[in-house]
Swiss-Prot record:
ATP binds at R281, A282, E283, E368, I369, S370, S371. Catalyzes the attachment of serine to tRNA(Ser). Is also able to aminoacylate tRNA(Sec) with serine, to form the misacylated tRNA L-seryl-tRNA(Sec), which will be further converted into selenocysteinyl-tRNA(Sec). One of its GO terms (biological process) is seryl-tRNA aminoacylation. It catalyses: tRNA(Ser) + L-serine + ATP = L-seryl-tRNA(Ser) + AMP + diphosphate + H(+); tRNA(Sec) + L-serine + ATP = L-seryl-tRNA(Sec) + AMP + diphosphate + H(+). Its main location: cytoplasm. This is Serine--tRNA ligase. Keywords: Aminoacyl-tRNA synthetase, ATP-binding, Cytoplasm, Ligase, Nucleotide-binding, Protein biosynthesis. It comes from Azorhizobium caulinodans (strain ATCC 43989 / DSM 5975 / JCM 20966 / LMG 6465 / NBRC 14845 / NCIMB 13405 / ORS 571). Pathway: Aminoacyl-tRNA biosynthesis; selenocysteinyl-tRNA(Sec) biosynthesis; L-seryl-tRNA(Sec) from L-serine and tRNA(Sec): step 1/1.
């Protein structure tokens, strides 16, 4: 969320940022003008309200003075004035609240401002490759896709999952289920033991304000799963809605909100959290995409990393987080590349994002397995998350970062396709064998 003071002082900076975000210039200008108009109306209304409140207080005192002076006519006139003010003040308060709500709604719908170092572009085709790590393996046979391998092994069952839950679900069984669990545990162990993250086991159900804090709401309302404890489904933002929860789309949501409504001391920073959780997404805009296999599912497992830093250290932390995500792929000896997302492809809350794309031999394509984003104070403003600088100045907003470390389901896909053998069996990567009870190969029973 943006500071209206910044927009008031640098309105053209907002327009430039939105245009870089691939918003049409006339739309950006119209939005700027609407924001400034609402801001002016809000400030004028508040000024008028302050004047009425001051006059009401003064008139109340003057009534006592008039009565003491036995000036009944003046006392009566003042009482009439106070009575009118008691009507006018609530009306003006309602007006101020309505303007504030409209302004906040517009501000909440504006994406983060991209850093100048972010390449400009419309979509994924304009992303910039930073580096390629490892080499593509050569196979003496045509590599199969993960779902072909899993189904042939009798360990990956989409048909039964569809009976249970519908499309975009899977049932993994036996050693394949254990391999998926091993991947998540391996990632967690690396991040905790080698990368300095604190493991957290967060709730999977969160409230409106938690989703708002990380900017999943209101922007991505249609891509979420809501859970209702009662039968009444109320509108988003309804303050009486104490029975609705949201299934987390990523552990970024609860982990980042751990610092909501708090003032930290600078010596506590950086804070680094990690969690391995199920994640739930409606995939509302993905009709027809990746309909087979585990690439795009309604429920998947992901290890998440979240960092809370000062503004001065967030860029360095961003590169550190990327290195942590890369490290787990290097340990698995998976070929991948790193790209910088362009302005038209980066996430709503991000000011800069690095994607790691792992090579899938069966698909003959790179696919995203991690996104590492720095959000600046965009989420912190929504959460009111601040810290007190060491030099004793007033509280400042923290910077937040998040990254996949990495997506467990997609890592399973990558391991299956990379480590497949001609007979359809899967070699278990060396670093995972201790998590697999010494199993070295997964083959059909």
């Amino acid at each position: 969320m943006h500071d209206i003071k910044w927009i008031r002082e640098e309105p053209e900076a907002l327009v430039r940022a939105l245009v870089r975000r691939q918003v049409a210039k006339d739309e950006a200008v119209a939005l700027r003008d609407k924001l400034l108009s609402l801001d002016t109306a809000r400030r004028e209304t508040l000024t008028k309200l302050e004047g009425l409140l001051a006059r009401r207080n003064a008139a109340s005192k003057e009534i006592g003075q008039a009565k003491a002076a036995k000036d009944e006519a003046r006392a009566a006139a003042l009482m009439d004035e106070v009575a009118k003010l008691k009507v006018d003040v609530p009306e003006l308060e309602q007006s101020a609240k309505a303007i504030e709500g409209e302004l906040d709604g517009l501000l909440a719908a504006i994406p983060n401002v991209p850093l100048e170092s972010v390449p400009e572009g419309k979509d994924e085709h304009d992303n910039v490759e930073l580096k390629v790590v490892g080499t593509k393996r050569n196979y003496a046979f045509t590599p199969k896709q993960h779902f072909e391998l899993g189904e042939a092994l009798g360990l990956m069952d989409f048909e039964t999952a569809s009976k249970l839950s519908g499309a975009r679900f899977v049932v993994n069984k036996g050693p394949l289920a254990r391999l998926e669990r091993a991947l998540g545990q391996f990632f967690l162990d690396m991040h905790v033991e080698q990368h300095g993250y604190t493991e957290v086991n967060p709730p999977l159900l969160v409230r409106d304000e938690t989703m708002y804090g990380t900017a999943q709401l209101p922007k991505f309302f249609d891509d979420q799963f809501a859970v209702y404890a009662g039968s009444t489904q109320r509108a988003i933002g309804d303050e009486t809605d104490a029975e609705r929860y949201w299934l987390i789309p990523t552990a970024e949501v609860p982990l980042t909100n751990l610092v909501r409504d708090s003032i930290l001391s600078e010596d506590e920073l950086p804070l680094r959290f990690t969690a391995n959780t199920p994640c739930f997404r409606a995939e509302a805009g993905s009709a027809g995409r990746d309909t087979r296999g585990m690439i795009r599912q309604h429920q998947f497992t992901k290890v998440e990393m979240v960092s809370i830093t000062t503004p001065e250290t967030s860029e360095e932390e961003h590169h550190r987080m990327l290195a942590c995500a890369e490290a787990v792929l290097q340990k698995l000896d998976l070929h991948y590349r790193v790209v910088t997302l362009c302005t038209g492809d980066m996430g709503f809350a991000s000011r800069k994002t690095f994607d790691i794309e792992v090579w899938l031999p069966g698909q003959n394509a790179y696919r995203e397995i991690s996104s590492c984003s720095v959000c600046g104070d965009f989420q912190a403003r929504r959460m009111n998350a601040r810290y007190r600088p060491a030099e004793g100045k007033g509280p400042r907003f923290v910077h937040t970062l998040n990254g996949s470390g990495v997506a467990v389901g997609r890592a399973l896909v990558a391991v299956l396709e990379t480590y497949q053998q001609e007979d359809g069996s899967i070699v278990v990567p060396d670093v995972l064998q201790s998590y697999m009870g010494g199993v070295t190969v997964i083959a059909k029973a």
